[in-house]
Amino acid sequence: QLLAQTLDCIAAPDTLVVIDPVMADNGSYYKFTTSQCVVRVYKNPIRFAMYDKNNRAVIYEEAEPLAFGLKTTQTMRRSGDEDFYGCGMQQGNFSYAGKEADIEVTGWDEDQSSNPAPFYMSTKGYGVFRNTFAPGHYAFNGTEMLDKNYDDGFKLMGFTSQLTHNENRFDAFYFYGPSLKDLLNDYTDITGKPFMPAMWMLTMGDADCYNKGEQRTGWPQSTPDVISQVADKYVEYDMPRGWILPNDGYGCGYVKLDSVVTELGKRGFHTGLWTENGVDKIAYEVGKCGTRLCKLDVAWVGEGYEFALNGCKSAFEGIESNTNERGFVWAVCGWAGTQRYSTVWSGDQVSNWDYIRYHIPTITGAGLSAMNAATSDVDGIFGGSPKTYTRDLQWKVFTPIFMTMSGWADADRQPWVYGHPYTDINRKFLKLKMRLNPYAYTYCHEAHMTGVPMARAMVLEFPDDVVTRDTTTQYQFMSGEWMMVAPVYTRKNVRDSIYFPAGEWYDYWTGKKYEGGKWLDKYEAKLDICPVFIRQGAIIPMYPDMNYVGEKPADVLTLDLYPYGNTSFNLYEDDGLTRDYKKGEFARTLISVSSPKGEKGTITVDIAKAKGDYKGRYQERTYLLDVRSESSPSNVTVAEKPLSAISPEAFNAGQEGWYFDASDRMGRVKVRTNRLSTNQDQKIVIGF
């Protein structure tokens, strides 16, 4: 770091570990040695470089001295096989080798910037955060330098990157990973970890306006109308739900807020407000009426990234100052540090098939700047159609946070609006998202601790696979560690160009097996199918079917298992609502599965006793195992006691036991236990 001033985008400058490097004069440069790398400071002209700990392999090197003036530019050498990620939310982009990125808001269309961040990282193992609120421009496509040969025989071809901000100062943090996940952790050590969402925030949000006179409905609206016109219909159509903004729109106020919040809560909704005039009423809105979400707008946040970040902070802290529950902010303009408080959203857009296509790398690219809660409106706010709505919704259920916004297009954006078959398909995917809450919640906690997002560009999970590094796989992503999603973004019910990294992969819907290192074309995906593939060894925890968080107890835990070798999943749970987890009130449950690799043999499932505690933790649980297997087992034991083979009917009626279904996704073993203590280790063995 060079002469850093503490800006609001820095979260905790006093908590950084101070490193005491060993300095030496090496003639043409000063050498600063740490346990992981060496920093060279060349004397004439002054330039910086980073090498490995042996001072032989170059990691980065400035090609020329910093250029100061009205703008400050850093020029870096780059290798021909080097790729770059970060730069915040850039519409339609996540990988920048040979490209340019605006580090300022330029718009909401493809190839524009909606939520920039002055940060990037490289496949060479380093990252840079420019500590500034000044707009900038990063060009990873310069070619004017001569090639350079290094001591270790490495040749750095004459490519450069020019990194510019509109100010006459230079203040930067450099990170050495070497992995991309390490770099995200380092970056968020400085700018702050992504906020930990309450579990209800992982359900679909619904935004509309019920105090706007020009609304196109043709009938007078008042805030309480949201209850009968929207909330009750979610109940009528058996639709999962979680949060709602009844005053989403310019000019919206609200009436009878306290009773509206109460009635919406009875129907499974948390209530938020579009906040246009600041947060001066937030004590009343949150503390007395019970709202839990603020949507911000430039109308009061003001122009500039510092104002926007301070607005997020004020709203977030305003919520948390008036309740023990967690803050939630919907931001218009993000920057480095926004991830501490807010979801970042890609803007007001017209939906079509291209909208779906380019939002895949938009969201995964934002994740590569630690924006775990990056999202966009389902089917945009303008345009759209029944099919684009359904296709857009079905892939977004595999991301942490998403919402709809009604009142701008001819058709509203509730999931039942287009009727059959779309209503049924939308319900299917929303119910799946609810069931996947323990999986998503665990990965959101990982994001909160490390900066690594849940919706991951393929390169983040498979960094050694060169196919994943550039835009080749930009239209697919990993949801957590185990689920790969390849959305359909054309009118045809076919998805081409699906890439499988090394290992075995299984179709989530049919169980068909695919070998890694290969491509798949012409995957048939009818409208009710989003291509999803499960990685070998997967452990996917699921809660019971429910329409909102807390509707039913979650004391039955399903484990969707794809045994292959030794794998594990460290389930994270807390009360799902309050900030008591910050006091240590949470529990981890390590779930481990061991089996032969790709062969028939004994499958052992170990469920460790819960480590930690919190109010409401289940002391006992029933476990349902849904295990991929191409053949029927000969026996199943729970805690070394034999489990009886039973009929599917008895199983579904709640009886303890197991059965094998050869017709279910190429073979599944179903196991149901009685209620077992979560304070003791549990072992389930499936023998063949």
Segments (PLM) and residue ranges:
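Acidic, contiguous internal or C-terminal segments within carbohydrate-active enzymes
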Residues: Q1, P21-E64, F477-M478, E585-Q619
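Extended Gly/Ser/Thr-rich low-complexity repeat segments
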Residues: L2-P13, R40-N54, E62-A63, F195, ...
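Aromatic- and carboxylate-enriched substrate-binding clefts and catalytic-loop regions
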Residues: T6-I10, T15, Y51, Y60-E61, ...
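Catalytic and substrate-binding clefts that recognize carbohydrates or anionic sugar/phosphate headgroups
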Residues: M23-D208, W219, A231-D232, Y523-P544, ...
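Active-site mouth loops of central-metabolism enzymes
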Residues: M204-P224, T275-D280
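Catalytic domains of carbohydrate-active enzymes, especially glycoside hydrolases
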Residues: Q221-G249
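Catalytic core of carbohydrate-active enzymes
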Residues: E317-G318, G327, T338, T343-V344, ...
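Extracellular/luminal ectodomains and secreted, surface-exposed scaffolds of diverse proteins
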Residues: K641-N679
